[in-house]
Amino acid sequence: MQTQIARAMFQVYEPIVLAAGGSNTPENQTICKQLGLGDHRMSYYATRSAPLGRVGAEVVSAIFYHHSVEMVSPAIPLAWSIASPERIVAARFEAVDQALRRLLPQQIESAEIAEAVALVRDAMLGCPIAGRPLFAAHAALQWPSEPHVALWHGLNLLREHRGEGHTSAVMAARLPPNQAAPMLIATTGEARDSRSWRWPDERWNHAVAGLHERR
């Protein structure tokens, strides 16, 4: 039952988190361009990992698990020399504020938003940080004062907590990072180019062969 509830919640908050705070939103792209963060890859890794501080590509790759160092290293740590992690965190919240004002202009000051923030903050009490470094870093941020931005922050926390639960499950199954990526592609039916995260062909093919051996 708990799994069913978690999945039902995910289906509700995932579209909201991505529509308002995803790296592809026009607001996020504009603000990241103003900061000088360059391409989509840099803006993605910088905005999502900024709460961790000035970490290197190896740390981001390890925490994101199935994102190879080769994929992360063109963006991190270069991003921190362009804008500080603290500025990037603030910029992401600014982009979320603008996006929600565009998407929900009549609702952002409603009583329902304020009530939802209270519920999400209560939900955080049941989300342990142990073994979830990215969630812990985001959870350590100060909650935004604007209720609609605070709601997005809380929903994003739920998303990151769930995501690192997936990482724990993959590790418990003894799936190395390079096998986790093709496993995801196999289950979603997506093309490899959309989800390869720049694993070199030799390592990718070795991972696929390893998955076949596990059957």
Feature annotation, model-predicted:
Residues 1-214:
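Phosphate/adenylate-binding glycine loop and adjacent helical scaffold
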